[in-house]
């Protein structure tokens, strides 16, 4: 349950936040497949509360497990999983299984949500299926965090056989429809013992969608653990991966100048991070790009953000996830939508970028170029580490790829790239296209060394070359 089930030669999950199923299917075929992406994390596919103003967070208030949302119905969902899997791109469901709604109302499929009466007839859940109401207000008390209500959301009792059965059935239905795994929302707010039982009840992946016999769903759990609380991320690694929140905090701090890049030489568990095989890593996500504090880098701070993403994708640690946002000015703001609340599809520009209010970080050349880099260096380790003892670093991945960063001053060095002799295209400033480089090129000599130059005033403080972008 720690294997992402990527097709061969692919890596990275991109979170297509609030996209419609038919747009995701198109994106799998037209962009994610040719660029080597491994999979897509989708927004919650089950019925959720229709909230005033249609904020993004309404999707995290379930009303039922009917597959009918602003992103599409079950037939659109199945069309997406079929087309994406055919393209070698996996689908991971954002599974909201800790709670139901925080208010009364109606869901996206027309079902009623009786928050006050603890009654969700479309499931059905009644008052006996929830923990007694109390407020999550003490992160030094694990029982409070797990058995009370997070911001007023009715808290399901996963210790109940009935509730477990409903959740297992929902997740197994998703497996039947061809998904490769689940991001588990609010896992910290559920008991590891209960989650272990639920995940052990999941079917193997559906071989009709190209998965191997006996393949298990990939599980990666939201456990925000920045230290100092009663609950540890390590409680959840026995039955799945965990989203490593410390990763983005530490990288964001470094690339904003709060820590010298030379200190990244031992990046990984020595920094207090999970073991690599247990970790799904990211620079920002849909929550902390809004409320994560100044250390979290986002698309709004593009130069250091792209450098942090490049470091994440260049380094072997963890299973990587990339955020693909819609532009927002207000933290509650929902996705691009028309006057009736219908989602608007992203527009695709000639230069690969998006319009209609979508940021599409995954379509930035500096990002997809590094996904290609990660595929090219699969199976290698960090070698030829160099630093100027400050904010300039470089390293190779075996003899397959080489990357250099400056976060202070111009970098002009003759460095050992570890690569075979030849001329390579920098995949940050451009790419290999039609037999030539559209950006910078780097010539590696017979001894593996090359003159590397990276000016501090350039658009990007990173340069990357690999064997699949060689002239």
Swiss-Prot record:
Residues 326-346 are annotated as: Disordered. The active site is at 185 (nucleophile), 222 (proton donor). The record marks 287 as: Transition state stabilizer. GO terms for molecular function: alpha-amylase activity; calcium ion binding; chloride ion binding. Its cofactor is Ca(2+); chloride. The keyword RNA-binding does not apply. Keywords: Calcium, Carbohydrate metabolism, Chloride, Disulfide bond, Glycosidase, Hydrolase, Metal-binding, Pyrrolidone carboxylic acid. It catalyses: Endohydrolysis of (1->4)-alpha-D-glucosidic linkages in polysaccharides containing three or more (1->4)-alpha-linked D-glucose units. SMART domains: Aamy (SM00642), Aamy_C (SM00632). Binds 1 Ca(2+) ion per subunit. Binds 1 Cl(-) ion per subunit. Signal peptide: none annotated. The keyword Calcium applies. Its EC number is 3.2.1.1. It is an enzyme of class 3 (hydrolase). GO terms for biological process: carbohydrate catabolic process. The modification Pyrrolidone carboxylic acid is found at residue 1. Residues 326-343 have a biased composition (Polar residues). PANTHER family: ALPHA-AMYLASE (PTHR43447). This is Alpha-amylase. The lineage of its organism: Eukaryota, Metazoa, Ecdysozoa, Arthropoda, Hexapoda.
């Amino acid at each position: 349950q720690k294997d992402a089930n990527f097709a061969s030669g692919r890596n990275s999950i991109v979170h297509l936040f609030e996209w419609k199923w038919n747009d995701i299917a198109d994106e799998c075929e037209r962009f994610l497949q040719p660029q080597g992406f491994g999979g897509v994390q989708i927004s919650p596919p089950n019925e959720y509360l229709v909230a005033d103003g249609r904020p993004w967070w309404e999707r995290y208030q379930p009303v039922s497990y009917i597959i009918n949302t602003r992103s599409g119905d079950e037939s659109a969902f199945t069309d997406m999983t079929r087309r994406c899997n055919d393209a070698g791109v996996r689908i991971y469901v954002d599974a909201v299984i800790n709670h139901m709604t925080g208010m009364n109302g109606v869901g996206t499929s027309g079902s009623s949500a009786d928050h006050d009466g603890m009654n969700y007839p479309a499931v059905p859940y009644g008052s006996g299926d929830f923990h007694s109401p109390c407020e999550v207000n003490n992160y030094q008390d694990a029982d409070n965090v797990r058995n009370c209500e997070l911001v007023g959301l009715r808290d399901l009792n996963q210790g109940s056989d009935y509730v477990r059965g409903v959740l297992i059935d929902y997740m197994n239905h998703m497996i039947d429809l061809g998904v490769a795994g689940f991001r588990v929302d609010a896992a910290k707010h559920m008991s590891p013992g209960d989650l272990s039982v639920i995940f052990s009840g999941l079917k193997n992946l559906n071989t009709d969608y190209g998965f191997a016999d006996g393949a298990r769903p990939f599980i990666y759990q939201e456990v925000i653990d920045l230290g100092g609380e009663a609950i540890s991320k390590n409680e959840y690694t026995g039955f799945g991966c965990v989203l490593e929140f410390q990763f983005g905090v530490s990288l964001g701090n470094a690339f904003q100048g709060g820590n010298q890049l030379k200190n990244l030489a031992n990046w990984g568990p020595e920094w207090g991070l999970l073991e690599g095989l247990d970790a799904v890593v990211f620079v920002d996500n849909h929550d902390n790009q809004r409320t994560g504090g100044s250390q979290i880098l986002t698309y709004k701070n593009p130069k250091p953000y792209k450098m942090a993403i490049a470091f994440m994708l260049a380094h072997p640690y963890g299973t990587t996830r990339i955020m693909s946002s819609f532009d927002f000015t207000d933290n509650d703001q929902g996705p691009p939508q028309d006057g009736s609340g219908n989602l608007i599809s992203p527009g695709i520009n000639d230069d690969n970028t998006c319009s209609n209010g979508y940021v599409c970080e995954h379509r930035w050349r500096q990002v997809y170029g590094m996904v290609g880099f990660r595929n090219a260096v699969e199976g290698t380790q960090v070698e030829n580490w160099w630093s100027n003892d400050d904010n300039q670093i470089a390293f190779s991945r075996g003899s397959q790829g080489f990357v250099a960063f400056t976060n202070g001053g111009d970098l002009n060095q003759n460095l050992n790239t570890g690569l075979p002799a030849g001329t390579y295209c920098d995949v940050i400033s451009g790419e290999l296209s039609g037999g030539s480089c559209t950006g910078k090129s780097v010539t590696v000599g017979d001894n593996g060394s090359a003159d590397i130059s990276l000016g501090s005033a350039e658009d990007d403080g990173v340069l990357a070359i690999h064997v699949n972008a060689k002239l």
